[in-house]
Curated annotation (Swiss-Prot):
Keywords: Cell projection, Cilium, Cytoplasm, Cytoskeleton. Residues 87-99 have a biased composition (Basic and acidic residues). One of its GO terms (biological process) is retina development in camera-type eye. It is found in: Cytoplasm, Cytoskeleton, Cilium basal body; Cell projection, Cilium. GO terms for cellular component: ciliary basal body; cytoplasm; intraciliary transport particle B; microtubule organizing center; motile cilium. Residues 110-138 have a biased composition (Acidic residues). Disulfide bonds: none annotated. Residues 358-374 have a biased composition (Polar residues). This is Intraflagellar transport protein 46 homolog. Residues 52-151, 358-384 are annotated as: Disordered. The gene is ift46. Forms part of a complex involved in intraflagellar transport (IFT), the bi-directional movement of particles required for the assembly, maintenance and functioning of primary cilia. Plays a role in early embryonic development.
Amino acid sequence: MASVAYICSLPVNTSRDQVSLATVHRLVFMERSERQKIQLTTNQPYDESFEVNAEEAASVHTPSPRQIVSRRTGRQKQSTMSGYAGEKLEEDTKRKKEPPPGPRGANKNDEEEDEDDDDDDDDDDSDDTESDEEEEEPGSAPEGAYDPADYEHLPVTGEIKELFQYITRYTPQTIELDHKLKPFIPDFIPAVGDIDAFLKVPRPDGKPDNLGLLVLDEPCTKQSDPTVLSLWLSENSKQHNVTEVKVKSIENPEKNPKAIDNWIESISELHRSKPPATVHYTRPMPDIDSLMQEWPSEFEELLGKVNLPTADIDCDLAEYVDMICGILDIPVYKNRIHSLHVLFTLYSEFKNSQHFKSATDGQKSDTPPASRSATAEIERLTLD
């Protein structure tokens, strides 16, 4: 750089050989103090620079282009300039051994060629700096981004091309979501049927509550009655010889009728769930299904003409039982209790039969409603 500055300071009418010899003598015989004073200027993107007085300078600060140039480009230009100075020295030493130069016109052409080479080098350096700046730009498009030039050659209509323009017009918004940890109490889901692990929370007063030992620990809002539960267990286990039975007492039953209703409902449900009692007859009795079969047609025609005997007939109870059991084909022995049991079992089966329920409902819908007094007389049962 010092040699270049010195060459620029020489007069214009000096020849090329004179310039090269002057440059060599200047660099070789330069004093040490002058070499220390020489400083290499930093890389600048422009060839010329000038100083402006502080009064004439604008008040607004404008950053110089050298701030944009990266360190990488500065080092490259420094290496290229140092290499360029070394090449100049080698050319000057070679030209000392060559014969004297030709006419002045050739020297002018050589100078013009050298200037063109310098301009080309400056252009290359500026291109390198621009490419480096483009690489280091933080806002550059990432790899695989949308490029409109890739879709310009598509054979589509103008409306479709307008749709592609919306891609470049769209600017996504960065929305920062606030993530907050909020404490919450999960819903309590009772696990009915799990084994009691006896992990109980003790009472605040420290007294033992015997939860799970004397009282069942059931995860349910509707707690079961211990007395009803013991009755259910004894019924299922067929053990009816339990000596100790806990009986729950209700305080102020007048003010707590709901507890009484619950007790009645639970006991009635217990009785409904019981299987029917089995009776062992001492004499052979017919099957209930066979007794529920239809009568012969001749007997049905006779019943249409002659009604069945009612309780108003002039006879005692034993004779009336024998008469009804004979009509229903139920055998009667000396002990009429078994015969009566079969009779009432047959009546219960007819009452609970779905077939006869639907038949009776159809007859009720066909027949007109009777008066209140007539129904009251029909449902009345007289016992002497």
